[in-house]
Design a protein with these regions (language model features):
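Membrane-embedded, hydrophobic transmembrane alpha-helices
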Residues: 1-98, 305, 319-323, 327-337
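Membrane-helix boundary/interfacial segments in multi-pass membrane proteins
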Residues: 4, 60-70, 239-258
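Specific aromatic-rich, kink-prone transmembrane helix
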Residues: 12-20, 253-275
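Transmembrane-helix signature of membrane-embedded glycosylation machinery that interfaces
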Residues: 20, 24, 57, 204-216, ...
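Internal/C-terminal transmembrane anchor helices
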Residues: 101-118
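Active-site lumenal/periplasmic loops and adjacent helix-entry segments of GT-C-fold
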Residues: 115-236, 242-251, 261
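Membrane-interface alpha helices of multi-pass inner-membrane proteins
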Residues: 281-300
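Transmembrane-embedded, aromatic-rich helix segments that form part
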Residues: 299-315, 322
Length: 337
C-alpha cells in the first residue's frame, strides 16, 4: 500500500483540485486554462489545509487521532464522489493526450525520471538533525497530536507557534502512516520523496508550458528541461551537500518541500498574475501561502515565499518594460531585439 501511495495521492489531489475549478467555472471565466499539473498542486494544497483544519479541531476539542483520521478519510471519500459526479455531468469530448507524436528526447526524460525513483529507493536518507520520525511515532503510539521540539528533542502536546514550525506536517505523515499499515520509514524516506519529486516536476512543467509552445520543437525543449532537472538531481544525489542532494536524500523535510514545489509554483503564479492578468491565480497564491505556513511555519515557509513573490514580481514588471521598449526578445514570438 505504501508504495502505491504516490499514485493514489496524485489521483486524489487531481480530483480535489478539479472540483472547485468546475464549481467556480475557472476555465470559463479566465482566458488562460488551468493545466492538470496546476490542478494537482492546488488539490494537494487543499488536502493539506483540510487536514490542518481537522488537526486544529482535534487538538482543541480533545478528539483522538484515529477518530480524526477516519473522519478525514470519510470527507475525502465524499469529495471524490462529488468530484466524479460533477465532472461526469460536465464531461467534454477531450482526450488526455490529443497528440501521439512523442519526441525521442521525451523517452529519455521518462528514463531519467524512473532512474530518480530508483535512486530514492536505493540511497540512504539523511536523517541527521531531524525529529520528524520521532513526532510521527509519538502521534501514532500516543493516539493524539504531538510535536517534537527541533531544538530540545522533547515531545510536547500539540501547539501552534507563529514564530516557529507548525506541526501539521508531522501529523500529516502520521495520518498517511496510519493508512499504510504503519510503514513509517518506507513512507517518510521512500514514498514521500517520490511524491515531492513528482509535484516538483509538475511545478517546473508549468514554467515549461509558459516558455515553450505546443509545436514539436516546443515539446522537445520541454523534454530537454526535464532531462536537465533529472540530471541535476542524480548528480546531486552523489554529492554530500547542496540543493539537489537534499532533494534526493531529504525529500520528506519541510524546507525541501518548500524549495522543490512551493518556490517555483509561487514564482509561476506571480508571473500569471502580473503578466497574464490572471486574477484567479491570486486565490491560488493565497492558498499557497497558507499551505506553506502549515508545512514549514513562518520562518522556513511563509517568509521565503513572500521574498520569492517580491523578486518574481519585480522581474515580471521589468520584463514587461523591456518587452515594451524592445530591449529583449520575446521567447515565443521572437519580437524585440
Amino acid at each position: 500500500m505504501v508504495y502505491i501511495l504516490p499514485v493514489f495521492m496524485i489521483i486524489v489531489a487531481y480530483f480535489s483540485g478539479r472540483l472547485p475549478e468546475v464549481l467556480f467555472k475557472v476555465n470559463k471565466r479566465n482566458h488562460v486554462s488551468v493545466s492538470r499539473g496546476e490542478t494537482c498542486i492546488n488539490g494537494m494544497f487543499l488536502l493539506f489545509v483540510l487536514w490542518d483544519i481537522f488537526a486544529v479541531i482535534a487538538s482543541y476539542c480533545g478528539i483522538g487521532f484515529t477518530v480524526i483520521v477516519r473522519i478525514y478519510v470519510a470527507v475525502l471519500g465524499i469529495i471524490l464522489i462529488a468530484s466524479n459526479i460533477i465532472l461526469y455531468r460536465n464531461k467534454k469530448p477531450k482526450q488526455w493526450y490529443s497528440d501521439i507524436n512523442i519526441p525521442r528526447i521525451f523517452i529519455l526524460a521518462v528514463v531519467v525520471l524512473l532512474l530518480q525513483f530508483a535512486l530514492i529507493f536505493y540511497i540512504a536518507p539523511d536523517i541527521s538533525e531531524d525529529n520528524i520520525k520521532v513526532s510521527v511515532l509519538t502521534i501514532i503510539s500516543d493516539g493524539r497530536l504531538h510535536v517534537t521540539d527541533p531544538e530540545t528533542g522533547i515531545s510536547e502536546g500539540y501547539s501552534v507557534s507563529l514564530l516557529g514550525r507548525i506541526p501539521e506536517l508531522d501529523s500529516f505523515y502520521a495520518m498517511l502512516a496510519y493508512l499504510t499499515d504503519f510503514k513509517t520509514e518506507a513512507l517518510m524516506y521512500r514514498a514521500v520523496p517520490v511524491i515531492v519529486l513528482l509535484f516538483s516536476y509538475m511545478a517546473y512543467g508549468l514554467w515549461a508550458d509558459l516558455l515553450c509552445d505546443k509545436t514539436d520543437d516546443g515539446k522537445r525543449k520541454k523534454s530537454i528541461l526535464y532531462v536537465v532537472i533529472g540530471a541535476l538531481n542524480i548528480c546531486g544525489s552523489i554529492s554530500m551537500s547542496g540543493i539537489y542532494y537534499y532533494q534526493m536524500h531529504c525529500g520528506f523535510r519541510p524546507e525541501v518541500i518548500i524549495f522543490s514545489v512551493f518556490v517555483p509554483y509561487t514564482a509561476y503564479l506571480c508571473y500569471r498574475i502580473f503578466r497574464d492578468k490572471d486574477h484567479v491565480c491570486v486565490a491560488y497564491l493565497i492558498l499557497t501561502y497558507i499551505t506553506s505556513f502549515c508545512v514549514a511555519g513562518v520562518i522556513r515557509g511563509f517568509i521565503p515565499l513572500i521574498a520569492v513573490s517580491v523578486i518574481s514580481t519585480m522581474i515580471v514588471i521589468w520584463g514587461d518594460l523591456a518587452h515594451k521598449h524592445g530591449w529583449i526578445r520575446n521567447v515565443k514570438t521572437g519580437e524585440g531585439r
